[in-house]
């Protein structure tokens, strides 16, 4: 009788970060926005036919400077936000389209649905985009956004944040997330930020002040890397 040695145990997968719930009770409107039907898988080959192809003629360098899109300077604290887009193994992802949008320094968005009684800034639209370079790096110049009320519950205020959107090799791979600023006193009260229940994952959504990125007498600098996949993935809104 031949006794076979036991099979080696399969290597344990790295634990995945706790990502936001689709339906988070503390975030009232998530009940309306969360999926109610099964996921629809696109036909094979669709992503290859309709995948995004971006080049230097599609994204202008000025698109990454949100303070230079109008005739005058916007109001508020000028900032530089930069970092790298990495895969789960830490390898840089080049030529990735990175889009951002945000409120102005008073906490107001320019769209008609924003009812916050704060002033609009005629010199600030609050949207930009760029392509990552060969090191996977992106860079934006902007104004630090203000906090704003959002009527989710009594005395509800959103911490200052910038929305980020990233495209992979197909439009179906789009990821959306939010970047926050260090030391914000509103973190403890924000159900969107706290929908990410893993504290380490929440910390990955917070940029780090960086004196080397800061430009003398011009702008404060922040570093924020975005990791797509793996145990160290940046939490996203669409998982």
Question: What residues fall within each predicted segment?
Answer:
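Beta-strand-dominated extracellular/periplasmic modules and repeats
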Residues: 2-239
């Amino acid at each position: 009788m031949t006794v076979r040695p036991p099979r080696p145990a399969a290597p344990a997968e790295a634990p995945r970060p706790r990502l936001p719930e689709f339906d988070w009770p503390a975030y009232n409107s998530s009940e309306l926005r969360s999926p109610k039907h099964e996921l629809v898988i696109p036909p094979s080959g669709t992503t290859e036919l309709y995948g995004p192809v971006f080049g230097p003629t599609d994204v202008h360098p000025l698109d990454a400077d949100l303070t230079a899109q109008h005739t005058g300077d916007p109001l508020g604290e000028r900032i530089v936000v930069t970092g790298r887009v990495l895969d789960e193994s830490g390898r840089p992802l080049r030529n990735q389209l990175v889009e951002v949008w945000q409120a102005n320094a008073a906490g107001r968005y320019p769209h008609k649905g924003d009812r916050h009684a704060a002033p609009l800034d005629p010199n600030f639209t609050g949207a930009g985009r760029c392509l990552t370079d060969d090191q996977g790096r992106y860079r934006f110049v902007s104004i630090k956004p203000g906090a704003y009320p959002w009527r989710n519950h009594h005395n509800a205020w959103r911490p200052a944040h910038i929305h980020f959107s990233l495209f992979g090799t197909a439009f179906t791979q789009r990821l959306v997330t939010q970047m926050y600023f260090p030391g914000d006193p509103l973190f403890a009260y924000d159900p969107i930020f706290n929908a990410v229940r893993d504290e380490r994952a929440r910390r990955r959504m917070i940029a780090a002040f960086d004196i080397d990125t800061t430009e003398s007498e011009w702008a404060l600098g922040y570093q924020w890397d975005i990791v797509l996949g793996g145990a160290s993935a940046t939490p996203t809104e669409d998982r």
